[in-house]
């Protein structure tokens, strides 16, 4: 099991394929940020993440996109929200999937929330 799967499952539980889509998307975001050194502003989830996840999951890109968007909204349900805070470092609004993927990808690679790393000046710029 990958770090991203552990993170996603601890937030949402092991429910269905849509959680696997999110785990794949977290892996892809981490790959773009850490392995390919891309800037967050330059990453377009519709072009750089969803198609790769769709190919890996052997599912249509539109379905993958909807699943990830839905799970981003589901994060703010009371039960899931409390499970999300350890990975974000604090309670904060996440409006779009790209933000959530960034925070989860950062945690999956470093083991600490981005916000806490920034407070301690330990976070590398992304």
Could you say what each language-model-derived stretch is?
Residues 3-126:
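Basic, alpha-helical nucleic-acid-binding regions used in initiation and control of genome expression
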């Amino acid at each position: 099991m990958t770090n991203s799967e552990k993170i996603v499952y601890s937030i949402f539980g092991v429910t269905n394929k849509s959680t696997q889509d999110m785990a794949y998307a977290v892996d892809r975001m981490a790959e773009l940020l850490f392995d390919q050194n891309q800037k967050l502003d330059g990453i377009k989830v519709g072009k750089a993440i969803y198609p790769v996840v769709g190919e890996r999951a052997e599912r249509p890109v539109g379905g993958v996109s909807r699943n990830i968007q839905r799970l981003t909204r589901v994060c703010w349900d009371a039960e899931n929200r409390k499970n999300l805070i350890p990975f974000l470092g604090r309670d904060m609004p996440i409006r779009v999937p790209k933000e959530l993927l960034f925070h989860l990808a950062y945690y999956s690679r470093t083991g600490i929330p981005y916000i806490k790393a920034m407070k301690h000046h330990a976070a590398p710029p992304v």
